Amino acid sequence: MSCKVRVIPKRDSNPAVLACLIAWIIFVFPVKGDQTIPQWHRLSDKPIISPRGNGWESAGTFNPAVVLRNGTFIMLYRAQDNTGSSRLGYAESTDGIHFTRRPEPVISPEAGYEKDGGVEDPRLVKFGDTYYLTYTGYNKKDAQLCLAESKDLIHWERKGVILAAYKGNWNVGWTKSGAIVPEKINGKYWMYFLGTSSDKTDQTGLAYSTDLIHWTEATREPVLPKRAGKFDSRVVEPGPPPIVTQDRIILIYNGADDRLVYRTGIAMFDRNDPTKLISRSDDPLFFPAMDWEKTGQVPNVVFVEGAAEKNGRYLYYYGAADKYIGVATAD
């Protein structure tokens, strides 16, 4: 099965640059009309990480961030206990599929904006020798987008809330899911994020910063809005940090329909103007199919948050039914 993306031709696309990207990035080459792109397939029919024990990761292990460090896949994942409080666990792998976990979380709820609810849904990006972690701080009242930094991915320094809830240009609710573009553009850092519009649907906005700590919304409306009748009619939520090519920003995102079935989409923005949407997938690349993706704490969910490339192959890590972690690719 495949899906289609409506593509606007771009004469200066560079195949040599794009060839090293994911298999489905072929659609950014200059073509006219519809271009068929392959859907992802699972590298394991079973979860690669599951809940365990009776403690901090007993109820759910899901929504992972992944980076490659010195040839090793490093994963930070959301772990939930039986009270519903979340922490971030740490795991390592040499092949990207079989992970060894640390026995204790690397981040636990400590700040007031995290108390009771916890730290949720990590995403990782690196600038220089520092890793930056965006995550949701949830205190059982508000969910807000937060930042922490680290040199070793184990010891983290909090930088606080970076986009406050209820205070956006168009967002009237919580802030979540900060996917930072891994390169500065026009002298600024850019971040796609989730906000809630006045009609109570969740959509994707864009913010910019000069220091990664103080952020300003770039627009007065979502840059990746919902679409009636599509797989993303109710929720349009950023996935992993985007991939940057010569002239494109490629954003994997998570879409939910009116029945709150979560599937995976892809959008393409102008590299020189991150607010400018060029195209997006008409149909999902990936969707719940396995029993453990359909049944869990929240049914019918695949939610991609991590992506890592090794030896020319991209692996995509996702939460399944808010309980498990899976991995997929497109080759």
Where do the model's predicted regions map?
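N-terminal secretory signal peptides that target proteins for export/translocation
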Residues: 1-12
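Short intrinsically disordered, low-complexity coil segments enriched in acidic
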Residues: 1-3, 27, 262
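Beta-rich carbohydrate-recognition and catalytic domains
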Residues: 33-117, 125-234, 243-300, 310-331
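Bacterial N-terminal signal peptides
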Residues: 19-27
